[in-house]
Each structure stands twice: as C-alpha cells, then as structure tokens.
C-alpha cells in the first residue's frame, strides 16, 4: 500500500527538521515547509487511521514534541494526504490563516480545568440547599404539618426542589471558578462534556511565563471550593488545541 503523509500540526518554521520523537506506527516525523511555516508529518499507509487510544496518544505526543520547534497549531486527528504536494497545497491555500493564528498564539500555552462533583460533594451541596433555600425551608415546614397522604407528595416535591436547586448551585459555583480563571488568562473556551458529574470543562490560554501562577491559582480554588462540594482538576501546559 502506498504511504501517505499524516499531518500532526502546523509550526512557525519552514526548516526541514526531522524529529527524534516517533509518531504513528513508530515512524519519525519531519517538517514540510512553505514560506515561513511548515507542517509536521510522518509516513503512514494511505488509508483511514483508526481512532484508537494508542493512535490518539501518538498524535498528541507528536504535537507536544513539535512545540520544541516553535508555536504549534494542532491539526485534527486523522488528517492524511496522498502525496507531499497535497500538504504543500494546504499550506499555500491556508497560509494567511495559519500565519495569523501562529502570530496570535506565540508564547501561549493552553491549560485545561474541569470542575466536577462526586456523591459526597453532591450531598454537601444538597445539605447547604436544605438549610438556605427559602422554598425548601417552606416546604419542610409544610411537610411537618401535612397529613399522611399530602406529606408523600410534598416530600417528593421537596426532594425534586432540593435536587434542582443543588444543580443550579453547582453551576453557580463553577461559574465563580471560571470567572476567576478568566481574569488570570488571555482567552477561554467552554468545552463540551458528556459526563453529568462535570459541571465545567474549560480551556484557558495563558502566557507562557504565567503558567505556574495560573496552576497555583487553580489549586487554591480547588481547596476553597472543595469545602463547598466541588473538585477542581487542572492540566497543562498543552499546545493550544482549543484556540486554533
């Protein structure tokens, strides 16, 4: 089968560099240049690449390794061209867009922050809601006075109100965390999450010299909001996946 060119990322260098780190299928990667930008590629069979954990991690490792060259724009997993001239055409047609993004993201890192809760955290938030929500307090008083038949439905209504208010409160708390981190970053992006327990999944663009301070701030927020039932998990620095 003919080998194609698998593209990992765009870099702000056209120098023909071979990276020591290996990419997909254990093959070394190199730079195909155009003007003052380049694409980091490696040879792979010209066929659809399976989105397996190993392949995705190999893609991510090469993107991170490419940052040694300079500013990096990650390319979507699975991007393959049949021949080298296909990569050159991509660089030629998209040059202005790539150049603008490379300039914007120079000296920047991406950090990820997830805010989530576990059973203990949810119980803590629910307990706070039961004590502070005027509606819940009112229903609890009504429950104490209600007869057996009415009390059953009142209790169901109260439990649903507690649950709804607890989730609203967690959203409110996660927004406080997000707003704080926004003030400590250059740009932010809210990301999708498929897990109900994750109430915030966000990426933040941070100047490279400010990365340690950003992680320290996220750590302090984690300690502060753990008392309120939320867990804060931070990661990075990464290439700016969410901003290019």
Regions found by a protein language model. Give the residues of each.
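An interfacial alpha-helical scaffold signature
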Residues: 1-244
């Amino acid at each position: 089968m003919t080998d194609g060119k698998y593209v990992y990322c765009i870099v702000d260098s056209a120098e023909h560099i071979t990276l020591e780190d290996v990419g997909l299928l254990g093959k070394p990667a190199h730079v195909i240049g155009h003007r003052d930008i380049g694409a980091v590629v490696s040879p792979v069979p010209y066929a659809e690449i399976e989105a397996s954990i190993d392949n995705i991690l190999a893609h991510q490792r090469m993107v991170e390794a490419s940052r040694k060259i300079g500013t990096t724009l990650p390319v979507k997993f699975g991007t393959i061209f049949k021949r080298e001239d296909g990569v050159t055409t991509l660089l030629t047609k998209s040059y202005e867009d790539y150049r603008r993004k490379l300039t914007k993201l120079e000296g920047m890192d991406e950090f990820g922050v997830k805010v989530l809760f576990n059973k203990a955290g949810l119980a803590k938030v629910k307990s706070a809601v039961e004590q502070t929500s005027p509606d819940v307090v009112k229903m609890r008083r009504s429950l104490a006075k209600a007869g057996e038949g009415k009390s059953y439905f009142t209790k169901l209504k109260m439990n649903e109100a507690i649950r709804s208010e607890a989730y609203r409160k967690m959203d409110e708390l996660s927004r406080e965390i997000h707003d704080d981190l926004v003030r400590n970053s250059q740009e932010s992006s809210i990301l999708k999450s498929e897990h109900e327990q994750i109430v915030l999944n966000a990426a933040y663009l941070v100047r490279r010299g400010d990365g340690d301070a950003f992680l320290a701030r996220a750590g302090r927020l984690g300690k502060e909001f753990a008392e309120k039932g939320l867990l804060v998990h931070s990661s990075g620095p990464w290439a700016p996946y969410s901003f290019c």
